Amino acid sequence: MEDAAADVDAAADAKLTGENDALLSSAFVGARPPRPRFSSHVVSLLALALALRPACCLVLALHGSRATLAALLTALAFYARAAVCAVLVARNVARDRMPLSPAQQAALGLLAAARLAFLYVALDAGRHYAPALAGALYGADCVCDALAFLLPRAYARSIMH
C-alpha cells in the first residue's frame, strides 16, 4: 500500500517539476502572444531623438548668432518635446506597447508647432540657409521614423501571408 502511495507522490512531483515536458508535442503547447522586442531600431530611435533632433535645434539657435528670447523659448520647447518623447517611449517600452499612442503623438505635435512658428519668423527673407537645412534634416528624420515603424511590420506581414 505504501509503495502505491509513493508512486502517486512521485508522479505528482514529476508533473510539478516539468520532467514530463519532453514528451509533450508542440501541438499541445499554447501559442505565445507576439511581443515587441528590443532591437537595433530602438537604439537608433533613441539616438535620433537625443542627437539629431537637438542638433537641428542647435543649428537654429546658432542662426545669425542671435540669442533672442523667442529663439531661447523655442529651443527650450524643442528640448522639452524631446524629453517628453524620451519619457513616453521609455514608459511604453516598459509597459510593452508601441512607442507612442495617437493622443501622445498629437500632444508632441502641438509642442513641435512652436518650432515651426519660429522657422517662419526667423527666415530673414531667405538670406540664410541654416533654417532650411534644419527643416530638411527634421523632415528626413520624420520620414526615417515613419519608415522604421512601417517597414518591419510590412515585412513581417508579407512573411506571415
Swiss-Prot record:
The chain crosses the membrane at residues 42-62, 69-89, 106-126, 131-151. Coiled coil: none annotated. GO terms for cellular component: host cell endosome membrane; host cell Golgi membrane; host cell nuclear membrane; host cell plasma membrane; membrane; virion component. It is found in: Virion; Host cell membrane; Host endosome membrane; Host Golgi apparatus membrane. Keywords: Host cell membrane, Host endosome, Host Golgi apparatus, Host membrane, Host nucleus, Membrane, Transmembrane, Transmembrane helix, Virion. It comes from the Viruses. It is a multi-pass membrane protein. Interacts with gK (via N-terminus); this interaction plays a role in the coordinate transport of UL20 and gK to the trans-Golgi network (TGN), and is required for their cell surface expression. Interacts with gB. Plays an essential role in egress of virus particles from the nucleus, cytoplasmic envelopment and virus-induced cell fusion. Forms a functional protein complex with gK and this interaction is absolutely essential for their coordinate intracellular transport, gK glycosylation, expression on host cell surface, and function. Together, they modulate gB-mediated virus-induced cell fusion and virion egress and therefore actively participate in these processes. This is Protein UL20. The lineage of its organism: Viruses, Duplodnaviria, Heunggongvirae, Peploviricota, Herviviricetes.
